[in-house]
Amino acid sequence: MLRSCTAGLRSIWALRGRREGAPRLSMDLQPARRLFSTEKVIHKDWALPNPSWSKDLKLLFDQFMKKCEDGSWERLPSYKRRSTQESEDFKTYFLDPKLVEEERLSQAQLFTRGFEDGLGFEYVIFKNNDEKRTVCLFQGGPYLQGVPGLLHGGAMATMIDIALGSCTGGAVMTANLNINFKRPVPLCSVVVINSQLDKLEGRKLFLSCNVRSVDEKTLYSEATGLFIKLDPEKSST
């Protein structure tokens, strides 16, 4: 999409240049510019405040950053893409080479970070390792609408999956996710997802969470999940 838009703009600029006698930008400079811009976006930490964050989200963020000062909590960074080493390790141990298209995989981005600021998933996760729990602050943007004015249930399920997974502390995959939706979440509102690790059995991790309003008075959802820790010696390849 972005490539097609860029190509279209390039054509328009070229036509205008010929008609108006404006100097044309040297084409050999453009790839370097585009690459620099892409790299900057990829390595940006998206779990930090931006202008689209509401007052509630910013206030909660500041409160948890205070809790991080004594080391009991930590903010988890979030990027659009996994590091090159992580991606290579995952491909080596867990992906069937016959099912991987290298060109497509090189363009892959994290689903929840594929939206412009404020339009989709705005969230940050804080983790307490000693208590084996996380708190996810989530604001769902207008592109996540289901029923008019309400957040799509699938978007909420996605965030629950991410929040539970953040409690595991390793490479895992979701085996089971059970969600009880109590109330619909208003679009563009802020919710707090409290997750915890309940039990560990070998490679199986059992977790639970609840989704509440900022004032904690409204319970939107409750969920449980079973995650499996990935083992290179038992890879699918």
From Swiss-Prot:
<feature type="modified residue" description="N6-succinyllysine">
    <location>
        <position position="66"/>
    </location>
</feature>
<dbReference type="Pfam" id="PF03061">
    <property type="entry name" value="4HBT"/>
</dbReference>
<dbReference type="GO" id="GO:0005758">
    <property type="term" value="C:mitochondrial intermembrane space"/>
</dbReference>
<dbReference type="InterPro" id="IPR006683">
    <property type="entry name" value="Thioestr_dom"/>
</dbReference>
<keyword id="KW-0496">Mitochondrion</keyword>
<dbReference type="GO" id="GO:0032587">
    <property type="term" value="C:ruffle membrane"/>
</dbReference>
<dbReference type="GO" id="GO:1902108">
    <property type="term" value="P:regulation of mitochondrial membrane permeability involved in apoptotic process"/>
</dbReference>
<feature type="modified residue" description="N6-succinyllysine">
    <location>
        <position position="204"/>
    </location>
</feature>
<feature type="binding site">
    <location>
        <begin position="203"/>
        <end position="204"/>
    </location>
    <ligand>
        <name>substrate</name>
    </ligand>
</feature>
<keyword id="KW-0472">Membrane</keyword>
<dbReference type="InterPro" id="IPR052365">
    <property type="entry name" value="THEM4/THEM5_acyl-CoA_thioest"/>
</dbReference>
<feature type="binding site">
    <location>
        <position position="182"/>
    </location>
    <ligand>
        <name>substrate</name>
    </ligand>
</feature>
<keyword id="KW-0597">Phosphoprotein</keyword>
<dbReference type="GO" id="GO:0006631">
    <property type="term" value="P:fatty acid metabolic process"/>
</dbReference>
<keyword id="KW-0809">Transit peptide</keyword>
<keyword id="KW-0966">Cell projection</keyword>
<protein>
    <recommendedName>
        <fullName>Acyl-coenzyme A thioesterase THEM4</fullName>
        <ecNumber>3.1.2.2</ecNumber>
    </recommendedName>
</protein>
<comment type="function">
    <text>Has acyl-CoA thioesterase activity towards medium and long-chain (C14 to C18) fatty acyl-CoA substrates, and probably plays a role in mitochondrial fatty acid metabolism. Plays a role in the apoptotic process, possibly via its regulation of AKT1 activity.</text>
</comment>
<feature type="modified residue" description="Phosphoserine">
    <location>
        <position position="37"/>
    </location>
</feature>
<keyword id="KW-1003">Cell membrane</keyword>
<dbReference type="GO" id="GO:0005739">
    <property type="term" value="C:mitochondrion"/>
</dbReference>
<feature type="active site" description="Proton donor/acceptor">
    <location>
        <position position="161"/>
    </location>
</feature>
<keyword id="KW-0999">Mitochondrion inner membrane</keyword>
<feature type="modified residue" description="N6-succinyllysine">
    <location>
        <position position="98"/>
    </location>
</feature>
<comment type="subunit">
    <text>Homodimer and homotetramer. Interacts with AKT1 in the cytosol.</text>
</comment>
<feature type="modified residue" description="N6-succinyllysine">
    <location>
        <position position="55"/>
    </location>
</feature>
<dbReference type="GO" id="GO:0005743">
    <property type="term" value="C:mitochondrial inner membrane"/>
</dbReference>
<keyword id="KW-0443">Lipid metabolism</keyword>
<keyword id="KW-0276">Fatty acid metabolism</keyword>
<keyword id="KW-0378">Hydrolase</keyword>
<dbReference type="GO" id="GO:0051898">
    <property type="term" value="P:negative regulation of phosphatidylinositol 3-kinase/protein kinase B signal transduction"/>
</dbReference>
<dbReference type="GO" id="GO:0005829">
    <property type="term" value="C:cytosol"/>
</dbReference>
<feature type="transit peptide" description="Mitochondrion">
    <location>
        <begin position="1"/>
        <end position="36"/>
    </location>
</feature>
<feature type="binding site">
    <location>
        <position position="180"/>
    </location>
    <ligand>
        <name>substrate</name>
    </ligand>
</feature>
<keyword id="KW-0963">Cytoplasm</keyword>
<keyword id="KW-0053">Apoptosis</keyword>
<comment type="similarity">
    <text>Belongs to the THEM4/THEM5 thioesterase family.</text>
</comment>
<dbReference type="GO" id="GO:0052816">
    <property type="term" value="F:long-chain fatty acyl-CoA hydrolase activity"/>
</dbReference>
<dbReference type="InterPro" id="IPR029069">
    <property type="entry name" value="HotDog_dom_sf"/>
</dbReference>
